[in-house]
Amino acid sequence: MSNYFNTLNLREKLDQLGRCRFMDRSEFSDGCNFLKGKKIVIVGCGAQGLNQGLNMRDSGLDISYALRKAAIEEKRPSFQRATENGFKVGTYEELIPTADLVINLTPDKQHSKVVSDVMPLMKQGAAFGYSHGFNIVEVGEQIREDITVVMSAPKCPGTEVREEYKRGFGVPTLIAVHPANDPKGEGMAIAKAWASATGGDRAGVLESSFVAEVKSDLMGEQTILCGMLQAGSIVCYDKLIADGKDPAYAGKLIQYGWETITEALKQGGITLMMDRLSNAAKLRAFELSEQIKEKLGFLYLKHMDDIISGEFSRVMMEDWANGDKDLLAWREATGKTAFENAPKADGIKISEQEYFDNGVLMVAMVKAGVEMAFDAMVASGIYEESAYYESLHELPLIANTIARKRLYEMNVVISDTAEYGNYLFSNVATPILAKEIIPALQKGDLGEPTPAVDIDNVTLRDVNDEIRNHPVELIGLELRGYMTDMKRISSQG
């Protein structure tokens, strides 16, 4: 097998990268009826597998779980999750042959094995589904010609897929049909019904491509969504301790600060986040964000280039073959950082506004990171809608995982693919920030409010205009209009 994207000519690459259409709600008037009465078998019962299955069952679909024989016999967590929720569970041999749609929701590194095991068991003309296209695009998996291959990719962790559905809403979702596998022309109908069954049509669905989903997803998770939050957490905590701040206070400011700050992003983009600051702090955050862009801009572009070329996937799959040696070493090192081991902040109260006032550097990191990730994707041929969802939109959801159990929780919730990319980025970004940004900080940048200064009206006007007119803000204003029922996700209350 070879990287599918690299087998395409330039015109085909640009076409696939640029596949992005926000679908009208009227296109989902039939809901998930296309899949009703069909047998749907999910392979894998992790966060996405379980929660998508729960939503689909509640939408009236026939859902069961195919697990490896050993997982059933040993009553592994996947078996327990499925059975405790009342699902039918069976081996591949028992369930796959009668399935009309098999959905592969196992980790990326298991996909090739799953495909080789289930493909001989699938009946003629069945469909095969993914929620991430890595196996098709980066591994270059060849699927039987009679099988329809589709994707429905919710843009958030599996737990949020369920919670949003339970409250009558949903999460934005990308859907796609693999152009090499749509023999009956039913792929889009299957993908639409699947997205509707998980609640995606209530929040907005983008018709995309496997290529656009993979390349944008990898870029977002490696840089702003995970890598920047990890690097920022480490250097900000270390700086607070160096300045003599109470370790418990410092830990809480960082742990819950990302979540509080990015909640403003969810409701009103970078503009609202910056508007939570005083005028003096806003100008300073803008200045810091420009400095961060100057120091880290090359790294964002390198990650984008390595994702487009397939170099990232090649290196990561080498680590897969080596027993995840690098991944496990980096995971262990993260667990030993000072931030991860900061004392609990029992009894320490930090108001919502204090997170902004004492976290100006963190606000600057978010602004710079979102804009750099968005710009790098768009410059590489990815449409603005996709770039928005993979940079700004998902950030509050990832920040929420840090609020729960710091970096450990973030790296547990995200995929191994995202975790590996996160370490590649943060391992380089952390020392750059520590050397180039932290030593030049001023009083009020982190850990205490920005001192009041005289404000020049023209300067403030120009900064406000620049913030509000960045392309990520313009497309975000449009897309958030489709998500009028977004709730707060704060774990703090």
Swiss-Prot record:
Q: How is the cofactor bound?
A: Binds 2 magnesium ions per subunit.
> What is the name listed in the Swiss-Prot or TrEMBL entry for this protein?
Ketol-acid reductoisomerase (NADP(+))
Going by the UniProt record, its keywords in alphabetical order are:
Amino-acid biosynthesis, Branched-chain amino acid biosynthesis, Magnesium, Metal-binding, NADP, Oxidoreductase, Repeat
Name the domain of life this protein comes from.
Answer: Bacteria
Record domain KARI C-terminal knotted: where: 209-345, 346-486
Similarity-based family: Belongs to the ketol-acid reductoisomerase family.
Q: Where is NADP(+) annotated to bind?
A: 45-48, 68, 76, 78, 108-110, 158
Q: Which residues form the KARI N-terminal Rossmann domain?
A: 14-208
Catalysed reaction, written as an equation:
(2R)-2,3-dihydroxy-3-methylbutanoate + NADP(+) = (2S)-2-acetolactate + NADPH + H(+); (2R,3R)-2,3-dihydroxy-3-methylpentanoate + NADP(+) = (S)-2-ethyl-2-hydroxy-3-oxobutanoate + NADPH + H(+)
Q: What does this protein do?
A: Involved in the biosynthesis of branched-chain amino acids (BCAA). Catalyzes an alkyl-migration followed by a ketol-acid reduction of (S)-2-acetolactate (S2AL) to yield (R)-2,3-dihydroxy-isovalerate. In the isomerase reaction, S2AL is rearranged via a Mg-dependent methyl migration to produce 3-hydroxy-3-methyl-2-ketobutyrate (HMKB). In the reductase reaction, this 2-ketoacid undergoes a metal-dependent reduction by NADPH to yield (R)-2,3-dihydroxy-isovalerate.
Its GO biological process annotations read: isoleucine biosynthetic process; L-valine biosynthetic process
What EC identifiers does the entry list? 1.1.1.86
Key word Metal-binding present in the record?
yes
Binding, substrate: 415
Enzyme active site? 132
In terms of NCBIfam families, this protein maps to:
ilvC (TIGR00465), PRK05225.1 (NF003557)
* UniProt: Mg(2+) 2 binding residues: 217, 390, 394
Pathway(s) this gene product operates in, as recorded in its UniProt entry: Amino-acid biosynthesis; L-isoleucine biosynthesis; L-isoleucine from 2-oxobutanoate: step 2/4; Amino-acid biosynthesis; L-valine biosynthesis; L-valine from pyruvate: step 2/4
Membrane-spanning regions, if any? none
- Annotated positions binding Mg(2+) 1: 217, 221
User: Which Gene Ontology cellular-component terms appear in the entry?
Assistant: cytosol
